[in-house]
From Swiss-Prot:
<keyword id="KW-0804">Transcription</keyword>
<dbReference type="GO" id="GO:0003677">
    <property type="term" value="F:DNA binding"/>
</dbReference>
<dbReference type="InterPro" id="IPR016658">
    <property type="entry name" value="DNA_primase_LEF1"/>
</dbReference>
<dbReference type="GO" id="GO:0003899">
    <property type="term" value="F:DNA-directed RNA polymerase activity"/>
</dbReference>
<dbReference type="GO" id="GO:0019079">
    <property type="term" value="P:viral genome replication"/>
</dbReference>
<comment type="similarity">
    <text>Belongs to the baculoviridae LEF-1 family.</text>
</comment>
<keyword id="KW-0244">Early protein</keyword>
<comment type="function">
    <text>Required for late and very late gene expression.</text>
</comment>
<protein>
    <recommendedName>
        <fullName>Late expression factor 1</fullName>
    </recommendedName>
</protein>
<keyword id="KW-0805">Transcription regulation</keyword>
Amino acid sequence: MAPCKYTPERVQMMWDAIAYNDSRRLAFMTDRPRWVHAHNFFDSAAQLFAYIVKNSISDVHVKPLEEGGREWVIDADFKDCADKAELMLKVNVGATAFMLFFEGKEDAVQRIMFSGNRGFHLWLKFCGKFKMDAPKSLREHWFNVFKQPAKLVSGDIRPGSFADCVRRAVHMYIGDAREDLVLRYWPDVDRDVFCNANKQIRAPFSYNYKGGDYSRCLTQQLQQRIKACSAGCLAGGTPPTSK
């Protein structure tokens, strides 16, 4: 039997990050691998950990609420990266673009997680405008806000738009903001995950067998980068403009 991929501490972090954790069904990938769907709820992180150990669990996914609905989760993947450094650069740029877009909106971002494979998951707070039971039409409206255009014209980018935020994020990490670079680093949001509230989603801090890594929180480091770059601009640094 392979060693357990989880510690009690990691399961506790995962448990604490799941809303309605004691009345929410979970789905599991075993080491074999195959999917297992637990029929009962878990009362505590300790009970969940015991289940994970007993069943040789690898991945943990959160299902929608019993009455329907699920958190708004922006799932963005970056394919064809040359190495881990390029992947994490694209993850940081893409996630930062969303942080900039939602900047000043306290009811928006809950957390941003590296998925453990090739992208990130941004969880939006469901106590504000992004309610769990929101209609699919509203989710699709927001998806279109984040959808990558076929081409960009710098003069047509409106301040505060998502395109503007991607451009600012690209400049923040690369020091350039040409249209081709903005399109290259534009985060590709999974429409199915974002728009369909009946889809299960990876639990924060869980293991990802595809990537061989754990989901981890990026929120604080992204906030620090934005703060540092903003201070640099105020001190006379170069603002994010296109070249």
